[in-house]
A protein has these predicted regions:
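Extracellular beta-rich repeat passengers
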Residues: 1-95
Length: 95
């Protein structure tokens, strides 16, 4: 498990990513001009899917707020995020 508190990033390709079975818990996060602030996915078949839980965040000027594969979970401010229409295309960006 990884816990992140009081993090910020400006002008970045990606923000916080959970992959291959990692569990990431973040709070008090600010991103500006981060293309993909949040992501969760399974890259290697021998590992599990990612879990990313973020509370109290602000993201501005992003391409897409999050990407995830079908089985990974992204929870932003207590709301479980569903796959968005650009997921498959955008996942290749963070691989």
């Amino acid at each position: 498990n990884i816990e992140i508190s009081k993090a910020s990033a400006i002008n970045s390709k990606s923000g916080i990513i959970s992959k291959d079975g990692s569990k990431v818990y973040a709070s008090d996060v600010f991103f500006d001009n981060v293309q993909i602030p949040f992501a969760a996915y399974q890259k290697k078949a021998q590992h599990n899917h990612g879990l990313l839980i973020v509370k109290n965040f602000k993201a501005e000027n992003f391409l897409v707020k999050f990407v995830k594969d079908d089985k990974s979970k992204v929870i932003l401010n207590n709301v479980t995020q569903l796959n968005n229409k650009n997921n498959k295309k955008m996942l290749s960006t963070v691989y």
